[in-house]
Amino acid sequence: MLEQIQDFARALQASRYAVALTGAGASTESGLPDFRSNTGLWKDVDPVSLISMTALRRRPVDFYRFYRMRFSHLWGAQPNPVHKVLAALQREGLLKRLITQNVDGLHQAAGSPDVIELHGSLRECQCLRCGRRFPSRLIDVEVETEADIPRCPECGGVLKPGVVLFEEALPADAIEAAIEAAMKADLFLVVGSSLEVGPANQLPVLAVQHGGRLAIFNLTPTFLDPRATWIFREKAGQALGALAAELGISL
C-alpha cells in the first residue's frame, strides 16, 4: 500500500481541485452500521414501508418508533480517522469540496468547514406545515401514541427529520453543488461508498468524463474500479491515516 499511497499523495499535492465523496463505509469505524451489507440497517425490514413520506403522514407513530430505534444511536457517534483526515485535508487546502451520502454530521464534528449533504442531516428537523427548521433534539423523544408525535413549537405541524426520506427528492442545492464540484475536479476520491446508489454514484463518472482522475478507498469492488487510477482495499481510516502521515499532516 505504501508505494500507492506515496503516488497518490504526490497527485493530491499537485491537484488544483480535489473533491471527495463519502458513503456509509466512512462512518463504520465510528461504530455505525452501513445500509447495504448483511448486517446493515435495512437487513430485516422494508425501509420504504416505514422511512417514507407516506409513512410519516399516515402512520406517524410507527414512523417515529422505527426512526428512533434505527437512528438514535447515530446522535452519540464520534468522528473517526476518516472524518479527521478529510477535515485536515480541507484545512490544508488540499481538498476543495467534500460531498457525503451520510446523515450523521460526523464530518462537521471533525471540523470540516464545508460539507455538501446529499441525503440531509440528522442534526435538524423541519415542520411539514410551515417549513421552519429546528435542532434535532425536538424529535429525540419516545413516541408511543399520537400525543407523543413531535410537533412544531411555532405552528403545531408534524416535524420531519432532516434526513431525505424515501419518496422525497434530494435537495436541489446540494445536487447542483455536487455536480458542479464533480465537473471541476481533477482528482476525485470515493471513500467508503459501494457506488450502488444514484445519483451520487454518477458524480465520479462526471469527474472522469471531464478529465479527472479517480481514487477509490473501499473494502469491496465498485463498478468504477476499471476507471480508477488508485484503488485502496484497506479500511478507509487505515489508508487515509497513511496518507496523512505521508503528507506530514497531524490530526
From Swiss-Prot:
<feature type="active site" description="Proton acceptor">
    <location>
        <position position="119"/>
    </location>
</feature>
<dbReference type="GO" id="GO:0017136">
    <property type="term" value="F:histone deacetylase activity, NAD-dependent"/>
</dbReference>
<feature type="binding site">
    <location>
        <position position="103"/>
    </location>
    <ligand>
        <name>NAD(+)</name>
    </ligand>
</feature>
<feature type="binding site">
    <location>
        <position position="104"/>
    </location>
    <ligand>
        <name>nicotinamide</name>
    </ligand>
</feature>
<feature type="binding site">
    <location>
        <position position="152"/>
    </location>
    <ligand>
        <name>Zn(2+)</name>
    </ligand>
</feature>
<dbReference type="GO" id="GO:0005737">
    <property type="term" value="C:cytoplasm"/>
</dbReference>
<feature type="binding site">
    <location>
        <position position="130"/>
    </location>
    <ligand>
        <name>Zn(2+)</name>
    </ligand>
</feature>
<dbReference type="InterPro" id="IPR028628">
    <property type="entry name" value="Sirtuin_class_U"/>
</dbReference>
<feature type="binding site">
    <location>
        <position position="127"/>
    </location>
    <ligand>
        <name>Zn(2+)</name>
    </ligand>
</feature>
<feature type="binding site">
    <location>
        <position position="28"/>
    </location>
    <ligand>
        <name>NAD(+)</name>
    </ligand>
</feature>
<dbReference type="GO" id="GO:0070403">
    <property type="term" value="F:NAD+ binding"/>
</dbReference>
<feature type="binding site">
    <location>
        <position position="155"/>
    </location>
    <ligand>
        <name>Zn(2+)</name>
    </ligand>
</feature>
<feature type="binding site">
    <location>
        <position position="36"/>
    </location>
    <ligand>
        <name>NAD(+)</name>
    </ligand>
</feature>
<comment type="function">
    <text>NAD-dependent protein deacetylase which modulates the activities of several enzymes which are inactive in their acetylated form.</text>
</comment>
<dbReference type="InterPro" id="IPR050134">
    <property type="entry name" value="NAD-dep_sirtuin_deacylases"/>
</dbReference>
<feature type="domain" description="Deacetylase sirtuin-type">
    <location>
        <begin position="1"/>
        <end position="250"/>
    </location>
</feature>
<dbReference type="Pfam" id="PF02146">
    <property type="entry name" value="SIR2"/>
</dbReference>
<keyword id="KW-0479">Metal-binding</keyword>
<dbReference type="InterPro" id="IPR003000">
    <property type="entry name" value="Sirtuin"/>
</dbReference>
<feature type="binding site">
    <location>
        <position position="103"/>
    </location>
    <ligand>
        <name>nicotinamide</name>
    </ligand>
</feature>
<feature type="binding site">
    <location>
        <position position="194"/>
    </location>
    <ligand>
        <name>NAD(+)</name>
    </ligand>
</feature>
<dbReference type="GO" id="GO:0008270">
    <property type="term" value="F:zinc ion binding"/>
</dbReference>
<dbReference type="InterPro" id="IPR029035">
    <property type="entry name" value="DHS-like_NAD/FAD-binding_dom"/>
</dbReference>
<feature type="binding site">
    <location>
        <position position="35"/>
    </location>
    <ligand>
        <name>nicotinamide</name>
    </ligand>
</feature>
<dbReference type="InterPro" id="IPR026590">
    <property type="entry name" value="Ssirtuin_cat_dom"/>
</dbReference>
<feature type="binding site">
    <location>
        <position position="218"/>
    </location>
    <ligand>
        <name>NAD(+)</name>
    </ligand>
</feature>
<keyword id="KW-0963">Cytoplasm</keyword>
<feature type="binding site">
    <location>
        <position position="24"/>
    </location>
    <ligand>
        <name>NAD(+)</name>
    </ligand>
</feature>
<keyword id="KW-0808">Transferase</keyword>
<protein>
    <recommendedName>
        <fullName>NAD-dependent protein deacetylase</fullName>
        <ecNumber>2.3.1.286</ecNumber>
    </recommendedName>
</protein>
<comment type="similarity">
    <text>Belongs to the sirtuin family. Class U subfamily.</text>
</comment>
<feature type="binding site">
    <location>
        <position position="101"/>
    </location>
    <ligand>
        <name>NAD(+)</name>
    </ligand>
</feature>
<dbReference type="InterPro" id="IPR026591">
    <property type="entry name" value="Sirtuin_cat_small_dom_sf"/>
</dbReference>
<keyword id="KW-0862">Zinc</keyword>
<keyword id="KW-0520">NAD</keyword>
<feature type="binding site">
    <location>
        <position position="104"/>
    </location>
    <ligand>
        <name>NAD(+)</name>
    </ligand>
</feature>
<feature type="binding site">
    <location>
        <position position="119"/>
    </location>
    <ligand>
        <name>NAD(+)</name>
    </ligand>
</feature>
<feature type="binding site">
    <location>
        <position position="35"/>
    </location>
    <ligand>
        <name>NAD(+)</name>
    </ligand>
</feature>
<feature type="binding site">
    <location>
        <position position="193"/>
    </location>
    <ligand>
        <name>NAD(+)</name>
    </ligand>
</feature>
